[in-house]
Amino acid sequence: MIKKINYNHSLIFFISCIFLSSFDYLRSNSFILICFFLILILGVSHGALDNIKGRKLIKILKIKNISYFYLVYILIGLGIILLWILFPQSLLLLFLIIASYHFGKEDSEFISKNQKQSFLLKTFKGSIIIVSPLLFNQNKTLEIFNSINFDLSNTLLVKTEFLVILLLLSFISNLILSFNKNYDEKSVLLMDFFSIITLNIFLNPLLAFTIYFCFLHSFRHSIKLIFELNKNFKKGIFLFIKKALPLTFITGIIFIVALNFLNHEFKLNESVNMVIFIGLAS
């Protein structure tokens, strides 16, 4: 059932991307606050079950108090933010690799449940999320990176030839991942690839990322979590909402407080970029 849901979802998402890209109003605006709240409500929730993973982890480590997990979880997040502020350029390559791998891995989990793909393959697959906005909307994308303390101006990531090579490698990775898979799984990978390309050709990079992150990446991961909680979809979705709501609410409060604080020192778009991307990374 989950494979059929993934196919139908990718088909609807692909058609929607083409439809949305046809509106000049959407192409000429960034919708900063709408992006912020969409990621806050829909995007953050797909990672809000980390506490369940934490409970499994402390059982393995034979730790009885869940508070230790939350303490370490918070300290890791704060540590990432601190390192980001102090050593941004040193973290740049690591950030890009981890982000690419994360997107490549989670967006292809539906076809690789019992199959191990290489780290490199999944990293190249997921690199399209970073490569496509830099290739098709470079100036605005560089503004986003600059606002989160990353300077790409002296890197290969501003060279068109290098970006085209990475884009081709991402496409080839999708073909390799789809090898020996059924028609639906092949179609999902290709529709996802061209959906992301379409979004980044026509829309502002922040809006393109928000649509991808909330309505493709987070949606697919949430569906996977729902079926892990309960094989009955209706029961699973209510259980997912119940378990995801507390951490989503807490994260939302932190994001809003951070935005309000940063907005006193920076422009609104810079503040939103910092909260979204540094917040998601941590």
Where are these predicted regions, by residue range?
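Short, hydrophobic transmembrane alpha-helix segments
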Residues: F19-L33, N263-F266
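Hydrophobic, membrane-inserted alpha-helices
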Residues: F13-S21, V72-I81, F103, L190-L199
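Alpha-helical transmembrane segments of multi-pass integral membrane proteins
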Residues: I97-Y101, E106, L121-T141, K159-L177, ...
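Predominantly late transmembrane helices and immediately cytosolic-facing juxtamembrane segments
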Residues: Y212-L229
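Membrane-interface helix-loop-helix junctions at boundaries between adjacent transmembrane segments
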Residues: L78-L135, F145-S153
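N-terminal membrane topogenic signal
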Residues: M1-F13
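Membrane-interface helix termini and inter-helical loops of multi-pass transporters
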Residues: K140-L157, L262-L268
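Transmembrane helix interruption/hinge and helix-loop junction motifs
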Residues: D24-I32, L82-L92, N200-F209
